[in-house]
Amino acid sequence: MAQPATPRTMAEKVWADHVVAHGIGEGAAREPDLIYIDLHLVHEVTSPQAFDGLRLANRPVRRPDLTIATEDHNVPTVDIDKPIADPVSRTQVETLRRNCAEFGIRLHPMGDAEQGIVHIIGPQLGLTQPGMTVVCGDSHTSTHGAFGALAMGIGTSEVEHVLATQTLPLRPFRTMAVNVDGELPPGVSAKDIILAVIAKIGTGGGQGHVIEYRGSAIESLSMEGRMTICNMSIEAGARAGMVAPDDTTFEFLRGRPHAPTGADWDAAVEAWRQLRTDPGAEFDTEVHLDAAELSPFVTWGTNPGQGVPLSGAVPDPELIVDEGERQAAEKALTYMGLQAGTAMRDVAVDTVFVGSCTNGRIEDLRVVADVLRGRRVADGIRMLVVPGSMRVRAQAESEGLDRIFIDAGAEWRQAGCSMCLGMNPDQLSPGQRCASTSNRNFEGRQGKGGRTHLVSPAVAAATAVRGTLSSPADLSAVPAR
């Protein structure tokens, strides 16, 4: 493959490969480009109005073979064989089923072996592949960028546009490189990396950019870890996040249901290797982190950028120079019920949630099981362990992880978005505090008045055992049997 005259970033390559028509005009007045979409993921919350629009215009779905749906946001994680109790949630799920049947779209409903969170089932089925454009009516579609795909969340009107045309008008983006080099210390995970990145650049630092995560620490991560990082690109304000595909990517995809096979596989891998950013390509912005200086990270406030190392303390708003940030910190501390100067390890929780499209994969559950093995959840702590898909659930049970969770006193649930967001029965009560492996700690995100601390799976498990924000290093050794 001949090198272009101007070196390009990976994101620029994927964009260029999918332009159906270039926008007319110059500068701010230029029209959007028309981009072809390779994979469209659908769920019950953002799709009903889109299907209604098709129906009113008497339009079919242009490429139902490139569209796949699942039920995730509103589904209960217990008693899934019974009718959904909440009428709004039940209506949304039933509507998705009718729409998929009418328009010929493949659906994985509750109880199906492949049902789960939309951003977990795409990769596990091999639907998400390097060099693709992927969209979904969900902000955390950026997860799929871990495969070298350009993956973006879209709104309901855009969902309708993709269903009708398999294209989307989009404006070109700026590019950002987040370089994380060096060796991660023991106990530091992908979740800690991305929380540290967001704390460094802020929740608006990536606005208008596609972030490419680079460096030796990123390359050392598993695909699960890379998905965690790309998943939270949106919390940094970015349009999308990406990691260049490599042998780790290819081994994850090999043999999956929708991955190429035989000669097609060999040709695909050869093409995927060409996606890496060209030597000499320039990014609009570059950020650098030293992996060796990272440690377990937790949030203290009400946005993902309000975070500190677990070894740190709740910051004092009076020491924040920017007036807007100071006021935001004061408001956050009032909502969170925290005092400046409080050691993060002294913050007690009521609930621990393990799951979500950020950390609901089998690797995450193995980490939690390793911490809980031979230990008990602290008295008064409720711990929910929610697999991100039914396939993850089955794998965990085949490895005996469910018994470790249950024996420790945790609740082992069915697949779904669960306590990540207050759209289903798994919610916090007002004033309850949760250590959560999810991606957002906004006011009321996990239930009205609920208080959320974003953490890694390892920190979540250790917190469940001690009852306060903790890492596995804080736990006493398990007695030998």
From Swiss-Prot:
GO MF terms here are: 3-isopropylmalate dehydratase activity; 4 iron, 4 sulfur cluster binding; metal ion binding
What this protein needs as a cofactor is: [4Fe-4S] cluster
SUPFAM superfamilies in the record: Aconitase iron-sulfur domain (SSF53732)
Q: What GO biological process term is on the record, naming one?
A: L-leucine biosynthetic process
Give the EC number(s) under which this enzyme is classified: 4.2.1.33
The UniProt family comment states:
Belongs to the aconitase/IPM isomerase family. LeuC type 1 subfamily.
- Role summary: Catalyzes the isomerization between 2-isopropylmalate and 3-isopropylmalate, via the formation of 2-isopropylmaleate.
Xref: PANTHER family: 3-ISOPROPYLMALATE DEHYDRATASE (PTHR43822:SF9), HOMOACONITASE, MITOCHONDRIAL-RELATED (PTHR43822)
Protein name in UniProt: 3-isopropylmalate dehydratase large subunit
**Organism, scientific name:** Mycobacterium sp. (strain KMS)
Protein encoded by which gene: leuC
